[in-house]
Amino acid sequence: MGQIQLLDEVHAQRLQQARHLFFDQGDLPEGLVDPLIVRSWERCRRFGIGETSMTPTTNAMDRIALKTEQERNRFLLAQGRPIMEHVFEQIRESGSMVILADANGLLLETVGDADFVNRADRVALSAGASWDENLRGTNAIGTALSEEAPVAVLGAEHFLEHNSFLTCCASPIFGPDGRLLGVLDISGDYRSQQHHTLGLARLSSSIIEKRLFESVHARDILVCFHSRPDYLGSPKEGIAAVSPDGQVLAMNRAGTSILGIRQVDAVRRDFSMV
């Protein structure tokens, strides 16, 4: 038996114990599951969701309404679609799908292996459905939006029992102005989970953010920087949009993180003084 399989079995046992403590006894399963998952479970309890609650298993909106929302999010879709397709090429035939959702958890577009897509459709994991946490319970899309952080939700970490066949990894996408725009998610069957998937989701969301920033500031002077030269040209590089007179017009999240400043503190300052 391989080490990964042993770790998966240990995780499953700890998760079963955690669910018993939380759902049957009302106690917090401290140390048994990720604190982020526990926070989400607590939010779901406050929402009044039960672990066996039945949520809508059909799309919440018709094609016309979905088209309207896709048009509303056309900027995100234009920059996100090529990345979705590239990610899917990396995981094709692994029983997975790639999802792009908006800031409210509405699934805008999906691409995936047909067999898994058909299974996912039975729990409304398809375009036009909302996976907001207050509707679907703990899930990577809704929880990543609530936490504004990358999230992996594996099997029975999902609040609702009928979603426990899923393993989902999602990473939020922020716009050039720092506003939360949506989330990129990679979902598959819990039994065939890949341990690199969360990293792939994080990298993909970073690439989309970079594309969004460069698109908005295509006519500005872009200054790229990083403390490590080998990171230049990667999604980890800082980018500042600068006016001809050297004023910072905007800076991406990677840039403000590198410099340890807030975006609002970088804007309208001379780049040489940032």
Question: Can you say where each PLM-predicted feature lies in the sequence?
Answer:
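Helix-to-coil/beta transition segments that act as allosteric "coupling" elements at the rims
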Residues: 157-175
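PAS/PAS-like sensory domain cap-loop motif
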Residues: 113-116, 120, 255-266
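Terminal output helix/cap of sensory domains in signal transduction proteins
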Residues: 141-142, 265-274
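Intrinsically disordered, low-complexity terminal regulatory regions
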Residues: 1-134, 139-152, 165, 174-245, ...
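Short, glycine-/Ser/Thr-/acidic-enriched flexible segments
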Residues: 158, 247, 255
